[in-house]
């Protein structure tokens, strides 16, 4: 048994010759906040494993519900046989801090530089520092607060994709917050 559900992301990478690839990753997570660091776990036989190991960088693209078919396609097809970026009609934008490109259609893109690779077994874990991120302007409110619920992000569990709820069910610390007393006449 493994932890479920998990986020599902599209990872873009580029080899030393400048060839782009995209693949789906469900084993992804935050591993540190200062400095901000993420991890992705990849099987060594995957094409993108070689690209990422060569360049020591990648970009995590958070897909929305409307990109679920492309997410699945990029997880079941190999970049060795097909140009997945072309097949999915993704628009690539050059990274700001890394040579890899990100997918413009994804509402959130996170540029990463690898700090460590841990061999685990079926997968190797790539631990990477977040260098910068790109967030769709439509996710911000007038006070510059990010509303990820507007992004319609997706998750993965036991071979199925799920959309995430659009409403918050709690707020960090709400379980211990004290209720304010009402003042008469106020």
Report residues per predicted region.
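Basic, polyanion-binding surface patches
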Residues: 1-186
